[in-house]
């Protein structure tokens, strides 16, 4: 943790004089923590305090990069930096990639025009690039003796590295299970939240990274999902009813539906909706139909919405909802609330020091 971090907590929480300062340091360094239990207590408090009993709970899921420096920090790697990247140039940065899940509080009574995304669960995504920092190729030619010496040095370093890794696993009990992808981490958190509130109904809004098979195919019964469809995804009509007996298994999907461009140009009438809400301002023309996103959700029936900006500021995209009874306006309105999680990421980094901790021990991270 950064220098004087716990002391800053004591001062900012107005706890000076309530006890000796060493009590606070001992609490954070020696107490046994169960972070998921802490998340559960926070989620229950938010739901009981800010959400009515019969309301559907809206969740937003995404990931964010916390930039770090140095190889000693546990769990760091090279990740895509969406903040620094542009449409034509992709930039990666060294740091932690956190996948998080937030409860969306829309238009509360104390702030009727605001939407807040309050984090209730997080997971650290780890990739295999954590040991490649600073190992650039040299442009100078090496002699045979230099290569031999470098090879000997590399073998010695590899042996020391294996020994250090074995020691770290013994001391810190590092989990050696296969690494999970970000969508798999999101699916894990969704299942966890569903177990906390088995009697509540949820709507999860995500971007295109989390709207595929890993999340959709494992969606709990009390969850609905709203997200964008991949631009090149194959959509199908529902399987037609069997009119006569035939050999083999029953069809699971019907004919393939039109692509985004073909659906945009066909003769189906557009409907225009005007939006003036948090995250979405302007007029959109939409078309809707039901079908299957077979690669992601198998034979689960979905509601598809083709959205086109009348001004041309937004790309034409297809969104889907697992609740086929929702109308297009409601689907787009709920999806626009996802922007609140981006604001939460920004505020946590700028005002709460999310990027400041630099821990070298797995449990501390």
How would you name each of these model-derived features?
Residues 13, 72-73, 110-365:
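Single, function-defining residue in the core of a domain
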Residues 2-81, 191-192, 199, 244-245, ...:
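Electropositive nucleic-acid engagement tracts
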């Amino acid at each position: 943790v950064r220098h004087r971090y716990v002391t800053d907590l004591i001062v900012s929480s107005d706890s000076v004089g309530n006890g000796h300062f060493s009590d606070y340091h001992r609490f954070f360094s020696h107490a046994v923590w169960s972070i998921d239990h802490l998340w559960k207590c926070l989620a229950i408090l938010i739901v009981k305090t800010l959400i009515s009993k019969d309301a559907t709970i809206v969740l937003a899921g995404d990931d964010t990069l916390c930039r770090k420096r140095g190889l000693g920090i546990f769990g760091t790697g090279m990740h895509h930096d969406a903040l620094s990247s542009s449409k034509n140039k992709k930039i990666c940065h060294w740091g932690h990639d956190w996948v998080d899940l937030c409860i969306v509080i829309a238009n509360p009574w104390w702030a009727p025009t605001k939407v807040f995304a309050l984090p209730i669960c997080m997971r650290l995504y780890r990739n295999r690039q954590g040991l490649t920092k600073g190992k650039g190729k040299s442009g100078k030619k090496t002699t045979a003796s230099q290569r031999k010496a470098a090879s000997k040095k590399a073998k010695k370093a590899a042996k020391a590295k294996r020994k250090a890794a074995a020691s770290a696993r013994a001391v810190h009990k590092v989990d050696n299970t296969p690494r999970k992808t970000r969508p798999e981490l999101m699916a894990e958190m969704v299942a966890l939240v569903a177990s906390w509130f088995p009697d509540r109904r949820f709507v999860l809004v995500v971007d295109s990274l989390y709207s595929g098979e890993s999340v959709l195919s494992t969606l709990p019964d009390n969850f609905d999902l709203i997200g964008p469809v991949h631009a090149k995804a194959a959509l199908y009509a529902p399987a037609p009813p069997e009119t006569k007996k035939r050999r083999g298994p029953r069809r699971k999907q019907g004919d393939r539906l039109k692509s985004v461009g073909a659906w945009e140009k066909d003769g189906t009438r557009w409907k225009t909706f005007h939006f003036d809400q948090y995250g979405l301002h302007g007029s959109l023309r939409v078309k809707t139909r039901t079908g299957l996103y077979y690669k992601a959700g198998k034979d689960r029936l979905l509601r598809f919405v083709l959205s086109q900006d009348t001004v041309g500021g937004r790309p034409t995209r297809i969104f889907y909802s697992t609740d086929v009874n929702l109308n297009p306006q409601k689907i787009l309105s709920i999806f626009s609330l996802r922007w609140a999680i981006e604001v939460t990421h920004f505020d946590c980094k700028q005002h709460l020091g999310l990027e400041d901790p630099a821990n070298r021990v797995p449990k501390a991270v």
